[in-house]
């Protein structure tokens, strides 16, 4: 025991990396962050205290520089950092051959689906949920905007991934296991497996019903067709997993990002007013709000980018990699040591951003802005860039523009604070918005 303590304190290759004392012996930072539900903010506190590289466990480092981001996730990252044994590896197959086969199929199929059905499915889902919530029919009736956003994004996700509308029972049960998986017991088991054995943990097969729905054009069917055209044998469970990931990416992450965007707009009425003015000039009716037009609106896209910066959906720890023996920011990381870059800390670092804690979409369109935009790259870069990036931007543009075009908003739960009242593990949840929604044009409800 004494020898082990001496090794951990003085002889371990990571012994000189700053961090909490207990992190030399146990993953105390992860335990603390999961127990408190403040992972996003705790990572930033650690980096504010110890600097740009922090030891957060016996064999885990967290970085907070854009140069570390380039090194770990950039074009050459795969040569020095592995998915094997990492948390990121838990999200999909780690088999290199399957990844090589599947990635171009997923990227191509998503882009084709986006072009063919993205806007249509988004409008259908929004119209149905606006109607079911009776939005705008009684101006004084409070509406849970966060619940409304959650439900139409769940429906859109189900249509895009598997061609069905989904139901409320499925919405609850499908993601209970994911959120439970981020609970203390499940997370510590995952950490123990990855830390002790450094072995990949393959997800079990997702149990999807065969597609018997009114939306036959969906990711699952397109992946099947693409695999058939290229004569590739892709196991069914891998097709299902990628559909599940799309579903979770839309419902499990985009809904909170959308709620965060509206939170900051409602808390900054000058930003909401400027966005209203920009969107109202797109067309004479809501039917003219095509994504081709919305993509050209600088302030709308700036609001989306600013939300990605100030309130990232995921903590960087979910993008963990395992070093094969590499140097990051002048620090040698021995083989087997896990590394990640914290997105929230990067997005709030004053060395990269002027007034980093202020919601300021103007920074993204100001030609004289001195901010370093490399410090906010929510979709990663290079070969590992998220294939759903275009779909995410389209979805946000359509949803935000349509609601802002049709309705005026008044925030009711003004005492809600996004930092104080939300829960953040590796995934940020719990943004609550109660509003009244008044039609801008009497009788024009959008459904």
Swiss-Prot record:
**How does gene deletion manifest?**
Leads to the accumulation of the monomeric compounds fonsecin B and flavasperone.
Give the E.C. number(s).
Answer: 1.-.-.-
Q: Which UniProt keywords apply?
A: Heme, Iron, Metal-binding, Monooxygenase, Oxidoreductase
Q: Which gene encodes it?
A: aunB
Originating organism: Aspergillus niger (strain ATCC MYA-4892 / CBS 513.88 / FGSC A1513)
Source taxonomy lineage? Eukaryota, Fungi, Dikarya, Ascomycota, Pezizomycotina
**What Pfam families does the record point to?**
p450
Q: What function does this protein fulfil?
A: Cytochrome P450 monooxygenase; part of the gene cluster that mediates the biosynthesis of aurasperone B, a dimeric gamma-naphthopyrone. The first step in the biosynthesis of aurasperone B is the production of gamma-naphthopyrone precursor YWA1 by the non-reducing polyketide synthase albA, via condensation of one acetyl-CoA starter unit with 6 malonyl-CoA units.
Name the top EC class. oxidoreductase
Q: Which protein family is it in? A: Belongs to the cytochrome P450 family.
- Which molecular function terms from Gene Ontology are attached? heme binding; iron ion binding; monooxygenase activity; oxidoreductase activity, acting on paired donors, with incorporation or reduction of molecular oxygen
Report which reactions are catalysed by this protein. Answer: 2 fonsecin B + NADPH + O2 + H(+) = aurasperone B + NADP(+) + 2 H2O; 2 rubrofusarin B + NADPH + O2 + H(+) = aurasperone A + NADP(+) + 2 H2O
Question: What name appears for this protein in its UniProt entry?
Answer: Cytochrome P450 monooxygenase aunB
Q: What cofactors are annotated for this protein?
A: heme
**UniProt-annotated binding residues for heme:** 386
Question: According to its UniProt record, in which pathway does this protein act?
Answer: Secondary metabolite biosynthesis
The domain of life is Eukaryota
């Amino acid at each position: 025991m004494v020898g082990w303590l001496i090794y951990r304190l003085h002889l371990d290759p990571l012994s000189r990396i700053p961090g909490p004392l207990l992190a030399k012996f146990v993953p105390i930072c992860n335990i603390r962050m999961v127990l408190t539900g403040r992972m996003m903010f705790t990572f930033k506190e650690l980096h504010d205290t110890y600097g740009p590289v922090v030891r957060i466990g016996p064999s885990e480092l967290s970085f907070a520089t854009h140069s570390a981001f380039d090194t770990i996730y950039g074009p050459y990252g795969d040569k020095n950092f592995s998915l094997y044994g990492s948390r990121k590896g838990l999200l999909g197959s780690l088999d290199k051959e399957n990844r090589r086969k599947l990635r171009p199929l997923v990227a191509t199929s998503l882009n084709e689906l986006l072009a063919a059905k993205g806007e249509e499915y988004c409008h259908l889902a929004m119209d149905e949920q606006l109607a079911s919530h009776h939005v705008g029919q009684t101006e004084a009736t409070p509406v849970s905007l966060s619940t409304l956003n959650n439900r139409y994004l769940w429906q859109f996700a189900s249509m895009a991934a598997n061609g069905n509308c989904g139901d409320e029972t499925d919405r609850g049960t499908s993601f209970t296991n994911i959120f439970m998986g981020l609970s203390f017991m499940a997370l510590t088991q995952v950490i123990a497996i990855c830390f002790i054995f450094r072995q990949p943990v393959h997800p079990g097969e997702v149990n999807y019903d065969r597609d018997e729905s009114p939306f036959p054009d969906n990711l699952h069917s397109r992946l099947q067709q693409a695999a058939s055209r290229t004569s590739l044998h892709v196991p069914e469970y891998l097709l299902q997993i990628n559909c599940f990931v799309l579903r979770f990416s839309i419902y499990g992450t985009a809904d909170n990002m959308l709620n965060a965007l509206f939170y900051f707009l409602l808390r900054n009425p000058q930003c909401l007013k400027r966005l209203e003015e920009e969107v109202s000039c797109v067309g004479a009716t809501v039917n003219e709000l095509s994504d081709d037009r919305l993509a050209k609106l600088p302030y709308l896209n700036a609001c989306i980018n600013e939300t990605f910066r100030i309130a990232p959906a995921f903590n960087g720890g979910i993008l963990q990699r395992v070093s094969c023996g590499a140097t990051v920011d002048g620090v040698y990381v021995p083989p087997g040591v896990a590394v990640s870059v914290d997105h929230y800390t990067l997005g709030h670092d004053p060395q990269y951003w002027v007034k980093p804690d202020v919601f300021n979409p103007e920074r993204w369109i100001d030609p004289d802005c001195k901010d370093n935009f490399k410090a906010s790259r929510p979709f990663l870069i290079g070969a590992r860039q998220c294939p759903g990036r275009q779909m995410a931007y389209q979805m946000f543009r359509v949803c935000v523009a349509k609601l802002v075009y049709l309705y005026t908003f008044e925030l009711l739960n003004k005492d809600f604070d996004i930092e104080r009242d939300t829960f953040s593990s590796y995934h940020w949840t719990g943004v609550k918005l109660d509003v009244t929604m008044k039609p801008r044009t009497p009788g024009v409800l959008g459904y």
